[in-house]
Amino acid sequence: MRFVSLAVGAALLGAAGASSISSNVGLLKANGVALGNWEAAYEKASAFVSGLTTDQKLALITGSNVESANGNFTPLYFLDGDMGLQDFYYVSAFSLSSALAMTWDRDAIYEQAKAVGSEFYNKGVQVVAGPTSQPLGRTPWGGRGVEGFGPDPYLNGLATGLTTKGYVDAGVIPGGKHFLLYEQETNRTSSFGSSGEGSPYSSNADDKTIHETYLWPFYDAVKNGAGAVMCAMTKVNGTMACENSDLLMKMLKTELGFPGMVWPDMNGQNSAKGSALGGEDYGSSSIWSTSTMESFLSNGTLSEARLNDMAIRNLIGYYYVNLDNGRQPTRQTTDVYVDVRANHSKLIRENGAKSMALLKNEGVLPLSKPHVMSIFGAHAGPIMGGPNSNVDVMGSGPTYQGHLATGSGSGMASMPYLITPYDALTNKAAQDGTVLRWVLNDTYSSGGGSSLVPSSTSSTAVEPSFENFATGSDICLVFINALAGEGADRTELYNADQDAMVNTVADNCNNTVAVVNTVGPRLLDQWIEHDNVTAVLYGSLLGQESGNSIVDLLYGDVNPSGRLVHTIAKNESDYNVGLCYTAQCNFTEGVYLDYRYFDAHNITPRYPFGHGLSYTTFHYSSLAIKAPSSITKAPKGNLTVGGPSDLWDVVGTVSARIANNGTLSGAEVPQLYLGFPDSADQPVRQLRGFDRVELSAGQEAVVTFNLRRRDISYWNLKTQQWMVAGGKYTVFVGGSSRDLRLNGTFFLWVGS
């Protein structure tokens, strides 16, 4: 893609002509958005568009070549995803976003995004189809939750914003997705007979739910430089998301001040008129044909101002990340040897280890040169066909018969190689002189009771079974996974075969460690209280270095610091949101997802949101709160890219002292939760800050959390804006949503 002979002139959008839209809502300049550092990109984009004919503008917004007096433009190239480039050789396979979120590490999230972005840039790809904020994880049965950052909007939003910034700084356009309320695979394109033939389901939610939960992360994306947003293939409140003017023109482009383009997910664009007027900016030429669009212009259905706005939005992200400087390498075919991986394997290994949460440890970890170690489960070793075997989750089983380290569909990376736990443990055993045995499937058990050396022979051979290998082992490592992805939702939150394997091994091995990699919440209660299950490592999908990351944790080369981004329940019935099988999917739970629902109904989880152990211990003290005595009820700032300017103002701080009172260096993740006055109608408490602090044994540090206006605001349905409630706020600081070690209060007087 290149601009050549670009003539820059001053051209702004013209006044709106007659249109079926009653106002200029959603048009960039008509909104009065203070563009800030987007202004230069806007001027370049509008100058280029000013010299185009109607046909050329239509070519631009449908992804065709444009040749004009102002220069030539070749279409932007869009590609998945956050875990690395799809369909290319010589690229890296990174941790999935759900794993990255489990690091609770701002630097890790940003640095991975920048590394991913650099590989896109150097392969000649302009638009990353990401970050994937949503599916948020409304239901633990959702198939694509693994691709996102989890169901807490604050954590999801921060990770979405940091990922967006990483892509921008790498020189590519972030294309945040999926907008909006796309939370399951079931019936995403299916028909419902006479109730909606051929239509996807409709996600129905009120404004409070939308703003406080699902729209929240997109504020962060827009604020940090999103140049594109993908509208979902499903409906919202009865209208296709890509034709929904309330979502696209009102919320995204006006409330959030989004300056970039909206483009559709697969099957997201259904009609020419609906998508053009609803807020889509880039679409299919088969739907937006020249004759159709010209007829819309001539009869006043589509205004010239809206067409210009669409064209400018297609270009503004390109200029914003400076792709017009001519430095990006030309895109090659996928198999051409252009190695863009740099030293990203080191980053992938580090982030994978940072992301795994130690849920349980009764002194068995870290390992230290065990004499005899056995490993069990298909998840420990490679799949027969290699790491890039096609994974079609439609109709597949709920587990993966090999080491699961990347997603499927849009969430599947292009693996250059895969280090499995079997690979990494073999190397470690060779270094330590450990006898290593393995059964690399989930169901191989033919009875047992044999000792390490059978009496019938002088060989060390043992009939392979769970019982035989577990008996006589110093340590038993059992690897299990849970599979789901694009195209199919989950059918279970546990697996009978895998759970039986864990119990069988534990019945015969005093030190059984379970290692779990999963696409979403995975229930553990079939074996978690077994006396011989002495440790559990739990995480998401870690990418090409997965086995090394896991073994670094098992042996203590890395001290665990990962934290859960979802609640692990004791029973499936403890979760309040299941899959929807009807045409109308009503989000009647409102904002009460995950820990917010568990807290509201006083349900005891197996492991709470934010939980994770370390090989050392930490002490919390010295809570200090600095809050204003008064504040205006609503934001008064100008509309900027990312919403009202003062919505982002820091209005208070909370600090606490964290001390490592153990014997090993480690990282703690202190978390800030906030309880609102009753008048705000909010959950019991909500995450409103966190940090990851590395401390040597005996070291301590003061951690400070900034409270922004948006962090103490709620969405007022009557006034249709963010408001601050007056009254008492309760502050909690601790190691999880249930491990709250410090608390205090502050009062706010709210003026007009």
UniProtKB/Swiss-Prot annotation:
Q: Where in the cell is it found?
A: Secreted
- State the InterPro entries in the record: Cellulose_deg_GH3 (IPR050288), Fn3-like (IPR026891), Glyco_hydro_3_C (IPR002772), Glyco_hydro_3_C_sf (IPR036881), Glyco_hydro_3_N (IPR001764), Glyco_hydro_3_N_sf (IPR036962), Glycoside_hydrolase_SF (IPR017853), Ig-like_fold (IPR013783)
Gene3D superfamilies, A to Z: Glycoside hydrolase family 3 C-terminal domain (3.40.50.1700), Glycoside hydrolase, family 3, N-terminal domain (3.20.20.300), Immunoglobulins (2.60.40.10)
GO BP: cellulose catabolic process
Give the Gene Ontology MF terms in alphabetical order: beta-glucosidase activity
UniProt keyword annotation of Hydrolase present: yes
Q: Which cysteines are joined by disulfide bonds?
A: none
Transmembrane stretches in the record are none
* Record-stated family: Belongs to the glycosyl hydrolase 3 family.
Reported function? Beta-glucosidases are one of a number of cellulolytic enzymes involved in the degradation of cellulosic biomass. Catalyzes the last step releasing glucose from the inhibitory cellobiose.
> What is the name of this protein?
Probable beta-glucosidase D
